[in-house]
Amino acid sequence: MKAMNKVWVIGDASVDLVPEKQNSYLKCPGGASANVGVCVARLGGECGFIGCLGDDDAGRFLRQVFQDNGVDVTFLRLDADLTSAVLIVNLTADGERSFTYLVHPGADTYVSPQDLPPFRQYEWFYFSSIGLTDRPAREACLEGARRMREAGGYVLFDVNLRSKMWGNTDEIPELIARSAALASICKVSADELCQLSGASHWQDARYYLRDLGCDTTIISLGADGALLITAEGEFHFPAPRVDVVDTTGAGDAFVGGLLFTLSRANCWDHALLAEAISNANACGAMAVTAKGAMTALPFPDQLNTFLSSHSLAQAMTVK
């Protein structure tokens, strides 16, 4: 099934070194934005990646991964003077992960407003706070969001907060606020809400992004699914149960499934959002069943099989 409107993804792409056995690692493509783009394209969506990589082995490897998965790389720039990002994924026994960055800043932080393509009405633009950590990528993300809204398109901002990547964490609140004000939809995790607001419980901070100017918030709750907050109310969407191997990229797969579904229509309403979140929950669940952020990102037949074999509880109105 082909998406009707193009999804533009800007930001990070990296080579992830994932533990395989003692003293050995799997070389896996990754990066939050790259994962989102590949997920959209694998599902049959039309997706373009806006970014910068080093003209090195890692950069050429990642560009080939994009091409192999059907992602448009017309606006992906390779620069011989820069080094592509490489990181080690540290996994716990239950599949939870943390990251050790071997290259920072990576080439992805050098994407600039000059790299942006022209946008069209009803298209989508995705960015996350990872793209806001350094200049000129920060300006590229914010300007891209502004131009997409000006063109009559939509913007999805994923908070995806990684404080260790910031040189000055005091910049975070203002940049999150600017991003939320530009966004049609904001996606945030429960933990991130607590980090941003200082609240002990995410429920007490669930309106944080709405209060910054974004009317639609999706809070990812891991194994508990997702909470949608709109002007119509609050709705909880349970997630399917799976055996967890590696949680790397689960949130990105969630966003990819969400964007793919939303891009199939010119306008979105509650019914389409509900379908999109159900698909997003399924994509996120599938992503954690194998090592590597992209390994288990589904193709359409795999997603359909998963949906038919996992009974998803109906969304529950919370408020």
Curated annotation (Swiss-Prot):
Coiled coil: none
Domain of life: Bacteria
Catalytic activities: 5-amino-1-(beta-D-ribosyl)imidazole + ATP = 5-amino-1-(5-phospho-beta-D-ribosyl)imidazole + ADP + H(+)
Parts of the chain that traverse the membrane: none
Disrupted-gene phenotype: Disruption of the gene prevents the efficient use of AIRs as a source of thiamine.
Gene Ontology molecular functions: ATP binding; fructokinase activity; metal ion binding
One GO term (biological process): fructose metabolic process
Primary enzyme class: transferase
Catalytic residue positions: D252
Binding site for ATP: D158, V159, N160, K187, E192, S220, L221, G222, A223, D224, G225, N281
Entry's induction text: Repressed by STM4068.
Ligand binding (5-amino-1-(beta-D-ribosyl)imidazole): D16, G31, Y101, R162, D252
UniProt binding sites for K(+) 1: A180, A181, A183, G213
Activity modulation notes: Potassium may regulate kinase activity.
This protein's record includes keyword Nucleotide-binding: yes
Record comment regarding domains: Does not show significant conformational changes upon substrate binding.
Function field: Phosphorylates 5-amino-1-(beta-D-ribosyl)imidazole (AIRs) to form 5-amino-1-(5-phospho-beta-D-ribosyl)imidazole (AIR), an important intermediate in the purine and thiamine biosynthetic pathways. It allows the use of exogenous aminoimidazole riboside (AIRs) to satisfy the cellular requirement for purines and thiamine.
Quaternary structure (record): Homodimer.
Protein's UniProt name: Aminoimidazole riboside kinase
